[in-house]
Amino acid sequence: MWVRVSRSFPCPVCGRPDWCSLSEDGEVVKCMRVPSDFSKVDASGSTYYIHRQGDSPVPIPGEFRRSDRGDERRAPVEVRAKVYEALFRRLRLRQDHRDDLRRRGLSEEEIGRRGYKSWPSFQERRRLCEDLAGTLGVDLTTIPGFFVNRFDSLSLGGGPSCYGIPCRDKEGRIIAVQLRNDDSGPEAGPKYIFLSSLRHGGPSPGYLTHIPLYDGDVAECRVTEGLLKADVATSLLGTPVLAMTNCSSFQGLRTLLPELKVRRLILAMDADHRTNRHVLLGMANTALQLRVVVEEVAIEVWDPALGKGLDDVAKAEGARQLLEGREAWQWLRRLCLGFRGLIMPPDLNEMALSDGK
């Protein structure tokens, strides 16, 4: 049973008097603002986070999803980068995958620079695993995507026909891999998946933010959803575009943006935030969470007829509109009010009615 916070008893995690709840015994907090390892999406599409009070022995309720399992098994970033980069050096890019990347707007030079590779066949994977383990001297089961299969052999995850998209950190290292499957449709599974060993008892890739290769200043940068989308937009626009793994995965940006010394962040999320409540709420929560770590948060929008994503509108060389200050918050508030039954983040209402800073 959950009890709503109030002005007389605010949330012990974020300190606010609304939107959050506590368990009846006060030991577990359901905070709508401050991320934790355990999260869930409620019926309205809002993500909330579970926190234990102090050293409470009360277990986290079983229905909550662990946000970042596998931490204890995951190798340090420098080891993961060593393995993934060695793996990618051993792979090639098939012509059909090269054609797909060209169709998206990337030049041959950019395709080579960014390092996309076709995923190996199941027969090749065993040989690659043996080669990497013998050459690098690394326990590959600590690397997301590698696992011991039912035949007691090292194996590498991924579908039968896909290509790998490097997820890079601020040093340009490959710290994770996203796979784009060739097949689509309900029977084929998701189009994009991250390489993970979680279902085999190994590590997941964890919270991720992709930083596309870019040589210029990043004091002003954009953020969107999707690695390949960010790569294409960075290449075509000539400006840095960071990538969240989904519309609500802002956790990594909270620490990354200050490290990069980003002053102005422009949210350039998919055009369907106008019609998809989950995308809209993710966008609103991202803006609210990140406004405290940068000087300014702005929003970039465009005519949906030009394309869904920032990469589409960049390829089309279409017009984009920048919403700044109070105008940006009012845009989000107005869209939230248009969804029946959607619970708007209280902080958003405050920002839209203030000067927007």
Predicted regions and their residues:
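Non-catalytic accessory segments of DNA primases and related replication-initiation nucleases
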Residues: 1-157, 162, 184-198, 250, ...
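TOPRIM fold recognition
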Residues: 7-12, 20, 30, 218-222, ...
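Residue-level marker of positions within ordered structural domains that often coincide
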Residues: 16, 36, 106-107, 170, ...
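Non-catalytic surface loops within mature trypsin-like serine protease
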Residues: 35, 169, 181, 271, ...
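Short, charged/polar, Gly/Pro-enriched secondary-structure boundary elements
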Residues: 37-41, 174, 319-321
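Short flexible/disordered coil segments
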Residues: 49-54, 181-182, 332-340
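Phosphate-handling DNA/RNA-contact segment within nucleic-acid enzymes
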Residues: 67-71, 126-263
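N-terminal, helix-rich and Lys/Arg-enriched segments in bacterial and organellar proteins
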Residues: 110-123, 127, 167, 300, ...
